[in-house]
Each structure stands twice: as structure tokens, then as C-alpha cells.
């Protein structure tokens, strides 16, 4: 053994060939700060071996290196810029030493090589991969850019266009594509990986392969003519501006850095990468996006822990077909859980099956499946008008009309048709689970399972724990949701649960703005372009359905009369009374017509102004900041109340529910991350300017207490990571 560290070791393999093996404690290798330091120490030993002929890098895990240790990132971002820059110089000196070894080097890459793992293998001369390879640089998705030489080496290896596509989009690619673009030099079966790697190294050692020529382009300026460079970078910047926009600075910074570094050799290019990386690491966007990643891991880990002793349902059922029922049935069948879809009439069943078939055909058109797979999946959805087969199902979700009487009747009837241990769930969006459970003989086997529309796209499923819901019931529904590829988040029962409970105060803020003379078009524009929502409130209401929102608004007002009971007729009432229900009938705040692809396209409709004038004061202008404040304060206050009341268990789960369920702008990181970025004291000052607007603008007492001491809601890291140089 030449060297033994905590996460890697160095040893002789055969005949002058050494192997550097990544073998961290635990299930995966990560390129954390300690591993970078250990790699430097291993190279120091290696550089003293005069009989060294070649070096093989490999992993003892199922994946090569899954990336940097993202749990270090938030504390790493606290490191002062000068110190962080120094550490990056050190880290890059380690990878440069690997690249500069006077012998051929090869990385035998199995499974994942992402982020720092990818940058590590880019420093070797050859890369041999297994068929399960996923390799790429996802850093821009975390608000940063490659910092270990990825933005320097990848363009010089692949050419500007392929490298820009991977780096700017934060992409990873599979083995076949990596081989095609030159990111790896060969693909071999896992059992032949080491044998093949040694064979390549031997050819390099004997001179049959020119490893020096392979290495040289990575040390030189990017080989592009002025015209080629202008075309590549102009197109890349245009694409990034269109897709990422101003709220996500990392992709554009990465493209501009690669462009600026193109005319330099390795050392100066790495300096430019360093100068770009460090400021990005200190942005609110980076903290927010890394926070989302960590929150996502926390939420999924919690779901896994809750279901560790639970068997995933093998047979499911959906009550109520139509678009929603068909979407749920499709998602279950697509992910391998056969489903019975029951309704009381053929028309609805046909609609549900048509929806499932439409979604499967889209997969076929995209080349994700073939006709055989399509037929196999659709055959596991069984439409029925009766309860045949319900004695074999493990879990049933009810998705009938949002009417408590109807839901109670359907659930009570179904309970008599299933086994005693079968779990029942309701896809209600606002009706308290306790109310629906009152119709059941076994309320402990019942909970809420709130899907978001469209089911196949929206990641979130709210799992609502009723007062009598058992832990096993909750775990079974979590297991099914996870199997369906969803992110389940458990919330406690109340009107609207979590997501809709905090959404309707946001809509109330919108209604008050319109009442006071705001133009809904400007509000939509500000909330989309400035704050970053995918849809402004008027557009969102049209998509949800004005009739649906009108009904839900009444449910919320009954549940929280002190805050959500209206004292005036608002814009939603006016549109509802005029039968303008949104996209579903082509008229809402906006007018909708089908585009060439059959999708609804919004257009202005002057008639709506006369309608809204009856519930609004004369038009007046509001600043962007005032619109954002008046829209967001009611939502943020309600989110805080939900945490204080135990409706949602943690800030992490609240933020992920809003990002995955409502499309809360990821660069803000969620409601609590946004609140902490503002600072609780600053937020309180802002909210107090609008408290005259009513109870929705009154800051909860718990948040007031934190504001007095300017305390964060998300626990704040006090210590930056200790960097080893």
C-alpha cells in the first residue's frame, strides 16, 4: 500500500501501473474538501515513484464519484471570497498535478461521475466507462458553475458547442452519447472494466497510443476561429437568455467565462473560472438552489424512513375517471402498479382511458417507449362500472367531484367492497379529512392524497393525516406515491391542508389589489417577470378554474372566517357570475384560443375590464415592489402560521411543497428561504406598512418575536467549512 486515506487509497496494480481507488465510508464516493486534500497527498506519494509507468483511477463503489458533497456547500459559501478563491486554486493545483503526471493516466468510470467526479476524470488522459454511466456537470442547476476545471477542460476536449450544452444546462449524459461526443474513449461491460483499462494503459505505455497528444489540447487555448467562436458563443448566450433568464445568473456566467477563457492556456483559463465561481457562490440564488437540493434529499429521506417496513402496494384503484382519474391511473400503471379505474358512467371511463392513452402516446412519440411497452402499460389499467376486483386492491384513491356529500357516499360504499386492511384515500383539495372520515367505519385506514394537476407533471402529492389516520395508513400511501415517482409530503388536517391554505391568501391579496384599482395584466407581469412565478395570479386562476377557485374560496372562508371571510364582492365573484370560468370555457381574466398544437393560448379581452370595473375602484398605478409585497405577505404569513400550528412539520417540507406544488420560484428557494433572505426584521417592517388592509397582513406573533431579534426561521449556519490547503 503506497497511501491510505479516509476516502481513497493508492497501491501498485502490476508492472509499474498504480491504481488510485476512491473508497469512502458509506455507500457512495463524494469529492468533499477532505477527499481533495487526500488526493493531493496521494499524488505527492505517487510523484516520488520513479518506476511509475501508468495510473488507473477507479472506484470501489457502485458509482465512481456522485459529485461534490453538497451538504458542505452552504457552509462553504460562508467562506470569505479571498479564502474560497485560495482553496479553489489549491484544489485545481491537485487536479493539475494529476493531469501533469509524466505517465499515461486512465479513469475507469462506473455509474455516476457528476460534478467534481466528472471534473476529476477530465484531468486524466483516457476514460473507459461502463454502460450504466451518467456523466456531466450539473453545477449551474445549483446556482454555481464548475470550479475544478470543468469549464476549461470540457470545451477543449469536446469542442465549444457540446461543452456549452452540457455546462449551461447542467446536463448529464449516458455512455452511448458520451462515447459519441468524445467524453469517454470506450464503453465496456462492468466485469471487463479493469481488464480493459489495463489493456489501454499498456498500449499507452508502449507507445501504441499517443497519450501526450491526447493530453495536449487541454493545456492550450480553445481551437476556434473568430467566426466559429462568435457563432458558438452568440447562439449559446441567446439560448441561455431565453431559457434561464435574469433570475438564474450561473448559466450565463459560465458561458461568458468559457468565452473569455477560450484564447488562454490552462493556467489563465483556470484563473478566470475561479474569478467567476467565487462571486456566484455568494449569491442568494446559489444558497436557494442548494437549499432546494438539500431539502429535496431531506424530504425523500424522510419518506424512505417512514416506509422502511412497508410493502409497496401491488394493486391500486381510482374512484372517478375523467382527466384527473385518468392521470392518476396512468401514473400508477406507468410506474408499475396496476390500477382499477371505476366510474358510474361509460362517458367518464372513456375520458379517463383516453387521457391515459394520450399520455402514453406522448411517451411513444418521444421514443421513451415502443408499441409493445405502450400496450403492456395500458393493459394494466382496468376500467369498470362496478366493484369487480376491489377485493384484491391494497389502496384506493377517490377522485370524484369536490362535494363532501358525494365523496362521503362513495367512500362509505367502497369501504364495504374492499378488504379490512385496504387503505382508502381522498384526492380532495380543500375538504377536511376529518369530515370525510366521519362516514367510515374504519377511519384509521383513511387519509388524504392530494394530487396536483396535471398529475404526470406535478411532483408533489400532499398526504393528509386525519385525526384518526394510523401510521401504517400514512406509510402505505407514501409508499404508493413514491412508487409513482412523486414527492410525498405529510401534512396535518385543516381546510385547504397546506398548499391551498397558503395559496388562497395569495389570491385574496390579488383580489384586494384589483379592488383598489390595480390592472390584473400588470400584476401578472410583475409576479411573473419580477418575482419569478411561472404564472401570474390571474393566469393561474384561469388555469385552476374560476368556478373551482370560487368554491374553494368559500370553503376556506368557512374554515378561517377571521382572516379569509370577504366583506366585499371581488373579481372572482364577478367572473364566476358572468360564467367566465377560465381556460375550461375559454373566458376568464384572459380569453383563450387553441394554438397550432391544440394548447390554449391566452389573449387580451377588453370585455373583462367592464366586468371588473363593477368590483374595483378607478384604475391607478402600483409600483412593482408594492405589488410583490401585497401579493406575498398574506401567503408568507399563512405559511408561518401553518408551521406554528404543526400543519407542516418543517421549513424544509414547506418550501418543497410550494416549489413542487405551486411552482414557487426555485431561485428564491421557497417561502421560508425567501423570508430569511429578506430578514425577519425587514419583513416585519414591510408587512406593517400594509396591516391596515386586514387580518391577512397581520404578522403572526411567533414571527414578530423572531423579528425583534432578527432571528432566522431556517437554522443558520454559524461556521464556514474548514478548508484544508
Curated annotation (Swiss-Prot):
Residues noted as binding NAD(+) in the record, renumbered to the chain: 324, 343, 400-402, 407, 429, 453
Region (Enoyl-CoA hydratase/isomerase): 1-189
GO cellular component: fatty acid beta-oxidation multienzyme complex
Region (3-hydroxyacyl-CoA dehydrogenase): 311-725
Site residues (Important for catalytic activity), renumbered to this chain: 119, 139
Quaternary state and interactors: Heterotetramer of two alpha chains (FadB) and two beta chains (FadA).
Name of the protein: Fatty acid oxidation complex subunit alpha
Organism (species): Salmonella paratyphi A (strain AKU_12601)
Gene for this chain: fadB
